[in-house]
Design a protein with these regions (language model features):
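Donor/substrate-binding cores of folate-linked one-carbon enzymes
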Residues: 59-60, 84-88, 100-222
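Residues that mark the start of a beta-strand
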Residues: 23-26, 125
Length: 222
């Protein structure tokens, strides 16, 4: 309260106090692609991160076997094509996150749009990986968009989730060069390697509290 009164209120700032002996609790959301999930779990099991992973959440059964390999509970809520049960699903997900005391969420190629309610519950605490060098090629199939446009590099971007699709504060980016010999399929393969690296870097920085967000941008402390 003293710090809040002395500094935060005066400068219209927000601050958080964390203790090193309390591990952040990270929930992972996935759909059908396994490359980012495997990379995150391998780093977790190798002890690279001071973090707990109490649950993996999905809208498909496809990756349950991965969760079982790492002995992490896997929860599935299927979403109808017309999204008529989307609100109900997110309520159930939010109850799980609260029960498991989740402090931040990683979207490891989770192919669903996060609602405003969940974003408000976890402001600047939902990390997404987008398979393009934002702000270029937002939305679906960015590698195919890049190939059709004839670009010479492709990239991946990890960012915090906001209400505007693929437009949140950027945490980490990287690129790789491509040539006329590449196909959409080869771009996807090259992109998957980038996605794993970029997402893991972003998660590392978040866990280490090295990110300051300001006006939809980030300041990264080394």
């Amino acid at each position: 309260e003293y710090i809040d009164t002395l500094y935060a209120q005066r400068y219209k700032m927000e601050f958080n106090l964390y203790f090193n002996d309390v591990k952040p609790r990270m929930a992972i959301f996935v759909s059908k692609m396994s490359h980012c999930l495997y990379d995150l779990l391998a780093r977790y099991k190798a002890g690279e991160w001071n973090v707990e992973i109490p649950c993996i959440v999905s809208n498909h059964e496809d990756l349950r076997y991965v969760a079982e390999q790492f002995d992490i509970p896997y929860y599935v809520w299927s979403i109808k094509k017309d999204h008529s049960n989307k609100a109900e699903v997110e309520r159930a997900e939010m109850e799980l996150l609260k029960k498991e005391k989740v402090t931040f969420i990683v979207l490891a190629r989770y192919m669903q749009i996060i609602s405003d309610d969940m974003i408000k519950a976890y402001p600047n605490h939902i990390i997404n990986i987008h398979h393009s060098f934002l702000p270029a090629f937002v939305g679906a199939k960015p590698y195919h968009q890049a190939w059709e446009r004839g670009v010479k590099i492709i990239g991946a971007t990890s960012h915090y989730v906001t209400a505007e699709l693929d437009a949140g504060p950027i945490i980490e980016q990287d690129v790789t060069r491509i040539t006329h010999k590449d196909t959409p399929e080869s771009l996807v393969l090259k992109g998957k390697d980038l996605e794993k690296i970029v997402l893991s870097r972003a998660v590392t920085k978040h866990i280490q509290r090295k990110i300051l967000t300001y006006h939809n941008k980030t300041i990264i402390f080394s």
